[in-house]
Amino acid sequence: MTLRSVLLALSLGAVTVEAAAAQEVPGAAPAGPLVIQADRVLDGRGGVIRDTRIVIEHGKIARLDPHAAGVTYDLRGYTVLPGWIDVHVHIGSHFGRDGRLATDKEPPAEAALGAAANAWRTLMAGFTTVQSVGEAADKTLRDAIDAGGVPGPRILTSLDPIIGRGDSTGSEEQLRAMVRERAERGADVIKIFASKSQRVGAGPTFTEAQLAILCGEAKARGLRTLVHAYRSSVSAAARAGCSQIEHGTYADSADVAEVARAGAYFSPQVGLVVQSYLENKAHYLGIGNYTEEGFAIMARDLPLDYAICRAAVATPGLKIVFSTDATAGAHGRNAEEFLGRVKECGQSPMAALISANSVNAASLGMADRLGAIAPGLEADIIALDGNPLEDLTAVRRVVFVMKGGVVYKWAGASAARAAKP
């Protein structure tokens, strides 16, 4: 069985099992209009719309019209908002049959099953678009979802990352060739490791000049760059013209200010990835650099993650995106990052939510397609049980998921109808 056929087989099982518990069965976006009635809509750009109806045609938002006839989905009593975007996940990272972190020794068919299951969990959590950075196999899943064969979020992928080794990484031409090769294979973004893992010291792996070559070549080919960076590599990546900088642990406010001056996007993770690692330690320990020492470093330095996030929120003009770095054990829990951003960083609930909508869409160069409830955009729409502006834990209670005009989840249908007069 090929990788693609495994994905297609899984999709049939996933849809059958999950849809049986829901009120709607996923399929192609209907050509005729759908109408969502809502009394509270967060538009993804900072606005709140009251008592309206969202008209959807051919998978896109056609208009907002409070008088539109023929309500298809009555979401009054819930909070309606654009589907969330997570710009840093590892969709293929999963635990194998033995409960341990799956490695490249896992059979391809099982790897495909794990990735597709993660995609489904992520979609059910309200994330309708993700950027997965780290595996060549992401392309197969991306294409299968786009073709409608597998249910999951829209995926953008870097394929395999570019990992630095200092001067031994290669000449200028070799560095440019690394970018070109990924572009030719269909990468949507170029992932660059400018620092080693936090678990092994977080030292630099590329010079600023090397980063400028890589990010410059990507830009020349119309591709964005996402850079894994700690310490001074944060400001080096900003000066090098890279698009998005992730993590930032051990950096300081001056480094973050450099990112703001450069106009790059920045994301410090505080609410999910380290916590998930620590919770799932037994599933990771002894594989690669997941050592006792590495886990101790992550636990010890979590307050430094909070500190750089607070510095980021306090930096004028800094464009903070929403990303989780979700790996095995964290998929489907992406929304926990919202709570971390508000509690540990001082971000307002609205700012945190916008970061996963219009800010993230802009960071992907897709503001004309995603990230807001507005005419002409993709009908990626979710609903929460509760008002996240008053009770942020509502982000954990996703009751409705639509992507591209197709409903994948409407768990509250029966209860909602029974409660309506």
Could you say what each language-model-derived stretch is?
Residues 174-183, 188-194, 199-266, 283, ...:
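Histidine/acidic residue-rich metal-binding segments in metalloenzymes
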Residues 91-112, 120, 151-152, 156-159, ...:
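Active-site gating loops and adjacent loop-to-helix segments of metal-dependent hydrolytic enzymes
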Residues 356-358, 362, 375-419:
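C-terminal cap of metal-dependent C-N hydrolases
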Residues 95-98, 142-143, 234-241, 272-287, ...:
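Histidine/acidic-residue-rich catalytic or RNA/ligand-binding cores of hydrolases
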Residues 112-138, 152-163, 187-197, 224, ...:
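Divalent metal-dependent hydrolysis catalytic cores, especially in the metallo-beta-lactamase
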Residues 78-147, 209, 237-240:
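Metal-associated gating/positioning segment near the N- to mid-region
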Residues 218-220, 290, 301-387:
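His/Asp/Glu-enriched, well-ordered alpha-helical/loop segment
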Residues 24-32, 41, 45-81:
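Histidine-rich, glycine-flanked metal-binding segment
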